[in-house]
């Protein structure tokens, strides 16, 4: 729910302390008639734990499981056993580096990874379209944020070329094929995820010392590599817009992935800012670059406000992918920088996405929040955004530029429910792909960093859901 355009008020009690600057740092919309901005929005979020109210339960998995082929059900059964309890999960994590790649490919990879090559990823995209998921966020899974492994086997130049090639050979045909057969603004953009730690040698030192003159050459190389890829996206957006001028959202988007806090603070935020200035000018109808903010960080609300102010002052738009966070188990000073409990993170996430969504609804193409990806497996957060978009009629720009995203193979019950029961069309899946050894590392990181999410999605509840879905599949 949003307040009416004629009279918007701030309800202080509904805004966490870190968001109070919203009241102080008001800004004026580019359109004089729009008196409503992120500074004076009434923020209304779903019932929160802190208020003692119920939290929306995720949909059961049975209906989705009934749509899967037998092979995928078998693979999911294996995942259910592997995540049955903490002992099983921790044992799998310890053994994972020693499990042969062919075994991982058979049991796990096809569920969570798009494939090893363009052909396999294209087929993955077609399967997703059949499920009502119009597009993907592709991620070539090669990274080295700790600077501990050599990239000599996959030189950075090759990663850049392969990434650009995936734009032209996967994302472009994936969306072109739909532009001629579906309503043009019902198709989500295609995204290419750029991991800064994969796009420069010695990434940890370069990102940590991003503003250090001694690292200028390496810094410039990282900026150039990201710019090469994003420029391809920008030029394709401009070209396609001439052919499809009624399109309200970008056709494709370059997305800067998050790194750990020290690298994010010292380098990645500045890298995002540079790319926003180059490829998201207010003079362009479409944005071409999105950055990532991890909202489990205590300072995330203030940081987004700071970035918003810089965007207003310098004539460009932000692109936001908002996640809860992926490094909770490996951050060195997590007790100081991350909310102390899940409730704090959930409240922060829902309030910030509410503010951004409301701003996009009210200000439309004049919003400095040019594009939003709600990257979450949390059903309450996804339904919050879905209901906000349903609450007003005149919000075609917001509907096109607010996209819901989940990881491939995860939260499929949520994805299925949003599409089937709520008519959501603005949905994508994050699709990692690439060399088997690298995707193996990705899968291990998912187990380590998302262990709690994996257990809640899988384990014994998944095994029971699979068992219940089998009789219905055979008509019993």
Swiss-Prot record:
Q: What is its EC number?
A: 1.5.5.2
Q: Does the keyword Mitochondrion apply?
A: yes
Main localization category = mitochondrion
Example GO CC term: the record gives: mitochondrial matrix
Which Gene Ontology terms describe the biological processes this protein takes part in?
proline catabolic process to glutamate
Please name the PANTHER family in this protein's record: PROLINE DEHYDROGENASE 1, MITOCHONDRIAL, PROLINE OXIDASE
| Name this polypeptide is given | Proline dehydrogenase, mitochondrial
Organism of origin is Saccharomyces cerevisiae (strain ATCC 204508 / S288c) (Baker's yeast)
Give the taxonomic lineage as stored in the record: Eukaryota, Fungi, Dikarya, Ascomycota, Saccharomycotina
GN (gene name): PUT1
